[in-house]
């Protein structure tokens, strides 16, 4: 009766369900890693890449199941040595003993460090691994795609930096390889407290980014904020550390909110103070944060000289910052609007020197500043021998010719030369570029409003500096807001015996400078 009553409600079994249900269920180790992949699908991923090579090998000529497909990128891997002397011999031994029957056994007994590709996103992972120098291995008998590390990426050896010249410090500097840069820091900081995390940014470039910090020193809130900003980045590619800095810091700041160095010894010094370091694959430098204005004044050589000489050099660089920024605008105010503030003999000399010059003082200063900026730009981008020759010869000859021809007065040329020399004391290139732009802005204010415009521009500049923060750390710290414990160490290079505390403005977990977790 029950069967007769349920007969009208019977459901038809879908087509193919009988065959699927009759198949024996595979164990987790026997299930194919990539069910939709085959040799043609893999090769189609790289059909437009001439540098990607593929070879098919047969481990046993009498068995069709012994076929293996190798795919690798020529020039980024040690294919000749690793494939023929390491990978193939071990696969031969494994196949003779076990055959291609179990993917799990292949991973454990083949003596190869195999990385199995995910089931759902094997195309993206396969392209990423091949262009990282890995060997992609496809076994049709197991429907398995895995990779073996045979990478040998183009890289150069660490050498002395051309920008941050070392006098007494270390000669090795960062290179374009991320692993080497991390090793240069790890070599100097042999502590398990040094945390190192990697991630990939860029939908197309998949640029590797390394984040390093001391987990028992650095402020956890700062590290968490850095990770969140990195995770929010969605872009096709990251090509330099400067682009990464622009994506994680506001672009309207004008001033660099992260320090930039090519010296691993300086990076290690910042890590032990509670800062973090960002390494970008392909960039021979590191980003350091949080950064403040006084950190950008320091140089890596400060820790390699005595306290007295380093303090004197740091004060000179601080003086160079203010002079190169404000001298042209201030001199223009005195020369154009407030001649009564100049000494009489100096005013008489300047007046005599300006006889016959057809240009106003403001236009003279503008031409001098533009001329010096062009010399600096040419000296930076030309080869070192040609750049130094052009800067010296061009400055001397053109400056003397401008005075003799009556285009520029000697006073304007001297002010421009002093500005250029004092600005050259700033070793941070990003800060130097910012000073050049702000110098022109102050010049415009002074040219229009005189001394009132000069002080207005300085006031607006101070307001901007006071409003900036780098990952929660005020840009003018420890001066504003005042951290009296940190102020002497920020302005001067005090003896090491006096430095028993880490900078309070960085909010370190372990604030003492006497070992791990010292109290």
Each language-model region and where it sits:
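Membrane-embedded alpha-helical signal segments
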Residues: 1-326, 344, 465-519
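Generic detector of multi-pass transmembrane helix bundles and their immediately adjacent loops
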Residues: 324, 330-333, 343-519
